[in-house]
């Protein structure tokens, strides 16, 4: 743009520092997903993959990601990882979970259940955060013009296909792009590598790998019939093998959307594990939406990924442990490892040397570390060998 104030001629140019990916390319779709993840304003829901990245004007779609542009997915998940903060949600106090362990980076069909209480199983489900937490109208609301989103926020009608344990993809191009970005672009940080982790690996293999093995460093994986997995919010599951629990009293009976386990014939994998870290009497274990209503946790917690664990302090579902060393006396292990407080823990079951060796190995885990087999791997292979029930995703 040229401007002339009578004194001098000013020339304004938009000079690209690099050529962005071409519309229609894989790299462009990933970049659009990044924009959708980090904008607190919004982008169009659909017909976005042919639009040059510089042609998106998020302020024209304010009110979609959040009301008054106060928050985005990236506000808590910086770089797609974690801010380390414990927030009070509808399920209770929850430390932000990093997204680097959501997918196996070798297999986009290897997806863990999501949230500490396994109440979701797709990035698409988190459109409900844009609406119910950030008070925007979300990224599946093309039936409303951007002005309505800004004015009405989450009072606009929700897309009926998007709910916890609803569709994995197909809600909108913007949500599918977010999913693509989480798989293709979010990566664990490289950790300092000690000279020798052999001793710690042996301790890990014997005591931790069954839950924290696998390419995502968690056994949590969707094996049940999905997309959607349930007929409606809090509705019946579409796969009879899913055991779905309501939170234990005194928690309100709904939402009853914790996916506790999946059974195929005589084989069962648990998603929620009780490791003795939920104290129902603690006044911090409250939910954000119901007075005197206790948080989820009595049934256990969805096994977290240990990818990059050295970087993601504090630890446990509400950040009770500031360091990995502090986890050991709190985390149940062995015959008395469930219930609060656990009578046997990592600290009581392992010698001081074993704990030191384990700590060295845990701090080294990153995307380059060879993983161990988990219960999830064993379950998948056993179901395949039977040749019954819905076949698990390819490994």
Predicted regions span which residues?
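Periplasmic c-type cytochrome electron-transfer domains
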Residues: 1-395
């Amino acid at each position: 743009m040229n401007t002339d104030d009578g004194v001098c001629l000013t020339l304004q140019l938009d000079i690209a520092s690099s050529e962005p990916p071409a519309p229609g390319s894989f790299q462009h779709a990933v970049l659009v997903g990044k924009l959708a993840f980090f904008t607190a304003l919004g982008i169009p829901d659909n017909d976005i993959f042919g639009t040059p990245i510089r042609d998106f004007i998020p302020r024209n779609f304010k009110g979609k990601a959040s009301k008054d542009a106060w928050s985005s997915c990236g506000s808590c998940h910086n770089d797609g990882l974690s801010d380390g903060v414990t927030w009070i949600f509808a399920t209770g106090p929850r430390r932000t979970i990093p997204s680097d362990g959501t997918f196996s980076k070798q297999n986009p069909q290897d997806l863990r259940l999501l949230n500490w209480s396994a109440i979701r199983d797709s990035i698409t489900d988190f459109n409900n955060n844009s609406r119910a937490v950030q008070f925007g109208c979300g990224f599946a609301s093309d039936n409303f013009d951007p002005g309505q989103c800004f004015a009405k926020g989450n009072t606009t009608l929700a897309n009926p296909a998007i709910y916890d344990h609803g569709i994995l993809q197909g809600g909108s191009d913007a949500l599918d792009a977010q999913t693509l970005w989480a798989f293709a672009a979010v990566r664990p940080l490289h950790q300092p590598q000690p000279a020798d982790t052999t001793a710690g690996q042996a301790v890990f293999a014997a005591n931790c790998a069954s839950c924290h093995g696998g390419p995502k460093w968690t056994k949590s994986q969707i094996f049940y019939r999905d997309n959607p997995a349930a007929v409606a919010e809090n509705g019946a599951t579409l796969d009879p093998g899913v055991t779905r629990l309501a939170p234990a009293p005194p928690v309100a009976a709904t939402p009853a959307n914790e996916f506790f386990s999946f059974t195929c014939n005589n084989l069962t994998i648990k998603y929620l594990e009780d490791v003795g870290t939920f104290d129902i009497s603690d006044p911090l274990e409250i939910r954000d939406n119901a007075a005197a209503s206790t948080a989820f946790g009595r049934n256990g917690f969805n096994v977290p990924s240990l990818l990059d664990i050295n970087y993601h302090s504090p630890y446990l579902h509400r950040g009770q442990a500031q360091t990995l060393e502090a986890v050991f006396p709190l985390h149940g292990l062995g015959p008395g490892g469930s219930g609060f407080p656990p009578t046997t823990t990592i600290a009581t079951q392992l010698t001081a040397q074993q704990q030191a060796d384990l700590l060295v190995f845990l701090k080294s885990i990153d995307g380059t570390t060879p993983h161990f087999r988990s219960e999830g791997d064993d379950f998948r292979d056993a179901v395949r060998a039977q040749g019954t029930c819905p076949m698990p995703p390819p490994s």
